[in-house]
Amino acid sequence: MQRILFILTVAVLSLSAGEAYAQRDLPGQTGIQFTSGGVNHFLSWKSGGERHYFTSLAFTHTNRNRTYWLYGLDYQIKEYTYENKAIPKAQFTGELGYFIPVLSDKGRNVCFRIGLSALGGFETVNWGTSLLPDGAAVTNGGSFIYGGGLTAAFDVYLTDRIIFLLQVKERALFGTDAGNFHTQVGLGVRFIIN
């Protein structure tokens, strides 16, 4: 048991080694982040079996003024019920965003940021299958989508290299057949990799 505790202690200390206190938002820092959460209804699964969720993977690069660029990929799915069958509408988007710090404490343990993003990608309805089991036809097919997003994000530093994220993003996408505006609420984690 003592050996396991020793190994865990060494592993945790090695993650935060090499930097002094509050070495956060330094120019040139690069991070990788994973975020997941709910879309519009903020529940992953509704009682009717519908799923409304998103997941994203992104890289960040910090600038001199504590702002950062975000380069990400996003997968969002919303299901609509028809005759007790869930019809999925999936969106695959790329994101290029710019985030600025609005408010933070003195040690930069907690930071509130606002971000603006450009989005572009592809949307598919019912995975490209236009005929339903009862013979009904889905008239919406796949389409290219484009637009932007406005994000409010809380970054909570667990260590200098591990950041807990809480984000609310409003996406405005055009070229879609099922609603232009979608709100995402998600939790995530970012690891500073350099």
Write out the residue ranges for each language-model feature.
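Short glycine/proline- and aromatic-enriched beta-strand/turn motifs that initiate or cap beta-hairpins
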Residues: Y21-G72, G186, R190-N194
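Gram-negative (and chloroplast) outer-membrane scaffold detector with strong preference
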Residues: A58-P133, I162, F191-N194
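Predominantly the C-terminal beta-signal and adjacent terminal strand-loop region
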Residues: K78, A153-N194
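Hydrophobic alpha-helical segments of small multi-pass membrane proteins
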Residues: L116-G120, G148-A152, V168-E170
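Acidic, glycine-rich flexible loop segments
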Residues: V138, I145-V156
